[in-house]
């Protein structure tokens, strides 16, 4: 073992809402830090050697699936992309993300929220044209394809929702993920909906007009999506529709 290795302390808020006797409490774990150790690696070592009951989510381990998002020292992050060495004092406090239903410990149900959001903004291409799978796909200009791709990189991790002050106060708020999803289809030429159609979906206080422009979503997005400009553009377009009514 190298003399340069240090011992880190990981504090986890543990709670099983399905238990009649379990109460929320912090539990501390100490472990030796290794080079390039991520929180994901640390949590796996804790579960393997210290606490097999510890619950947290992961799938890809590469910042692609978004499953391992959690509150790290008060900020939503992906465990698989967060190095333990980035915390100088070696003390890391982990909690489940707010605004989502708690499953157990660090595991939350983001799936139901994103499923509901998908239905609310009707996030699929709307077209009056009858589908004909024998036809060549409609040509899309490279600039448009790039703009759509940029907004479509969302991995549904929930970091933007967990960091949103409006979401904490307004449970039905659609959040940055919902507004970004709406904008993604507004700029897609495959979708034939008008701005008026989108206004019916996101043109209220639970939609784009509920945003307080704190931009925590933009600051915490692990994929660095252009949420600030996306939300601003959506708000301007919805404002024009509202004024015309």
From Swiss-Prot:
Enzyme Commission number(s): 1.3.5.1
Positions of [4Fe-4S] cluster binding: 154, 157, 160, 221
Superkingdom in the source lineage: Bacteria
Record keywords: 2Fe-2S, 3Fe-4S, 4Fe-4S, Electron transport, Iron, Iron-sulfur, Metal-binding, Oxidoreductase, Transport, Tricarboxylic acid cycle
Positions annotated to bind [2Fe-2S] cluster: 60, 65, 68, 80
Gene3D superfamilies linked: 3.10.20.30, Alpha-helical ferredoxin (1.10.1060.10)
Leading EC class: oxidoreductase
Domain 4Fe-4S ferredoxin-type, residue spans: 145-174
Binding site for [3Fe-4S] cluster: 164, 211, 217
CDD domains according to UniProt: fer2
Listed GO biological process terms: respiratory electron transport chain; tricarboxylic acid cycle
Subunit structure, as described in the record: Part of an enzyme complex containing three subunits: a flavoprotein (frdA), an iron-sulfur protein (frdB), and diheme cytochrome b (frdC).
Similarity-based family: Belongs to the succinate dehydrogenase/fumarate reductase iron-sulfur protein family.
The protein's name in its UniProt record: Fumarate reductase iron-sulfur subunit
């Amino acid at each position: 073992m190298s003399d340069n290795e240090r011992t880190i302390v990981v504090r986890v808020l543990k709670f099983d809402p399905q238990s009649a006797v379990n109460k929320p409490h912090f539990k501390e774990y100490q472990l030796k830090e290794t080079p390039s150790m991520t929180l994901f690696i640390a949590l796996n070592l804790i579960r393997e050697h210290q606490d097999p009951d510890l619950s947290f989510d992961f799938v890809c381990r590469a910042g692609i699936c978004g499953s391992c998002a959690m509150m790290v020292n008060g900020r939503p992050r992906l465990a698989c992309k967060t190095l333990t060495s980035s915390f100088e004092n070696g003390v890391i406090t982990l909690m489940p993300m707010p605004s989502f239903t708690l499953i157990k410990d660090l595991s939350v149900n983001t799936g139901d929220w994103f499923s509901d959001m998908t239905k609310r903004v009707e996030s699929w291409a709307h077209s009056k044209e009858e589908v004909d799978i024998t036809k060549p796909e409609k040509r899309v200009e490279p600039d448009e394809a790039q703009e759509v791709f940029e907004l479509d990189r969302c991995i549904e991790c929930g970091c933007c929702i967990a960091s949103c002050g409006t979401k904490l106060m307004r449970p039905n708020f659609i959040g940055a993920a919902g507004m970004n999803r709406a904008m993604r289809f507004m700029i897609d030429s495959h979708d034939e909906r008008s701005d008026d159609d989108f206004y019916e979906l996101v043109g209220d206080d639970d939609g784009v007009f509920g945003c307080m422009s704190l931009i925590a979503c933009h600051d915490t997005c692990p994929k660095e999506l252009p949420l600030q400009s996306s939300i601003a553009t959506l708000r301007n377009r919805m404002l024009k529709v509202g004024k015309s009514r």
